[in-house]
């Protein structure tokens, strides 16, 4: 789905180019909703076109497709354009429609991503901050190198995920969790560097 860019969005993009000329990523592929109405359209598109196969492919990775059947709703949830319960209620309503078009594993997977992961972790965040941000359970001490910022680590799935993140300001949760975060942990990258990288890379990054 393509979103039209209003005057405020265009002005903001010009400001970003002028004031942050050396920032990560690119605005060439910018295609995100900036209003509640447009975010609702994205939710509707996901429910109509993607939810039916989300359960089967929710943990898949594809070198040539970073979207697959994912909802792309995280930026709208984190910015307040959509409410988590709003998305859950709409998904359940879609599941209950006659015809059994939406399989249970798709509904469960989507609801779990919002309620069982996002909202649970948000609760952990509020219950443990600010000390949680300074914790370092594994005592990691290594810093990120430039290859983590341009996708030249030499590890194909990791480089693919990094380059995808740079191009779109987004990559799905399996790339983030199972590939990027996992490799940062296995190579001993400090939590502060990890946090900084994720905050710099994604359109849905924001402190709660």
Predicted segments, located by residue:
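Glycine/tryptophan-enriched, flexible segments
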Residues: 1-110
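Active-site-proximal binding-pocket segments
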Residues: 72, 77, 82-208
């Amino acid at each position: 789905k393509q979103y039209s860019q209003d005057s405020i969005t265009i002005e903001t993009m010009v400001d970003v180019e002028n004031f942050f000329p050396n920032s990560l990523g690119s605005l060439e592929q910018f295609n995100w909703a900036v209003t509640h109405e447009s975010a609702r359209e994205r939710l509707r598109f996901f429910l109509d076109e993607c939810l039916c196969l989300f359960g089967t492919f929710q943990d898949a990775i594809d070198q040539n497709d970073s979207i697959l059947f994912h909802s792309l709703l995280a930026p709208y949830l984190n910015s307040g354009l959509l409410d988590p319960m709003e998305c859950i209620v709409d998904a359940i309503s879609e599941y209950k429609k006659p015809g059994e078009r939406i399989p249970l594993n798709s509904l469960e997977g989507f609801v779990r991503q919002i309620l069982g992961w996002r909202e649970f972790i948000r609760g952990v965040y509020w219950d443990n901050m600010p000390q949680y941000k300074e914790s370092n359970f594994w005592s990691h001490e290594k810093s990120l190198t430039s290859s983590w910022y341009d996708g030249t680590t030499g590890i194909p799935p990791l480089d693919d995920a990094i380059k995808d993140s740079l191009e779109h300001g987004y990559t799905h949760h399996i790339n983030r969790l199972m590939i990027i975060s996992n490799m940062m942990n296995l190579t001993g990258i400090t939590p502060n560097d990890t946090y900084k990288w994720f905050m710099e890379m994604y359109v849905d990054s924001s402190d709660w």
